[in-house]
């Protein structure tokens, strides 16, 4: 997939064909533009996340799981959107076998300033 276009369609099936990666990766970056980074992720188990420098959005394509963040456990499912601010510890747990999500990092280091 070319990452140089100013507009494009990113197809789930094409992105999914790149997983697992050569070293067994369960995610593939499909688009980069400035501070924007989009990847398809097909994790196979609980993912302990490290806090990220940028704000992060997850678009849940299929499946279900639980987002552990700020001491809370929030269940989610296909069609949901998750937001995690920069620097927040979080973990994706109890994912179903068919789980897939688009992961989007964006904005400046430290995250956007709330309105």
How would you label these PLM feature ranges?
Residues 1-40, 45-49:
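A short, N-terminal "cap"/entry segment at the start of jelly-roll beta-barrel domains
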Residues 86-112:
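Ligand-binding loop in jelly-roll beta-barrel domains
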């Amino acid at each position: 997939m070319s990452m140089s276009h100013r507009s494009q369609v990113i197809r789930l099936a094409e992105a999914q064909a790149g997983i697992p990666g050569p070293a067994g990766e369960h995610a593939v970056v499909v688009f980069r533009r400035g501070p924007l980074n989009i990847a398809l992720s097909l994790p196979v188990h609980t993912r302990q996340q490290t806090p990220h420098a940028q704000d992060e959005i997850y678009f849940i394509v299929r499946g279900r799981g639980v987002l552990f963040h700020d001491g809370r456990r929030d269940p989610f499912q296909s069609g949901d959107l998750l937001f995690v601010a920069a620097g927040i510890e979080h973990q994706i747990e109890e994912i179903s076998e068919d789980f897939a999500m688009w992961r989007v990092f964006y904005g400046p280091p430290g995250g956007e300033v709330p309105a």
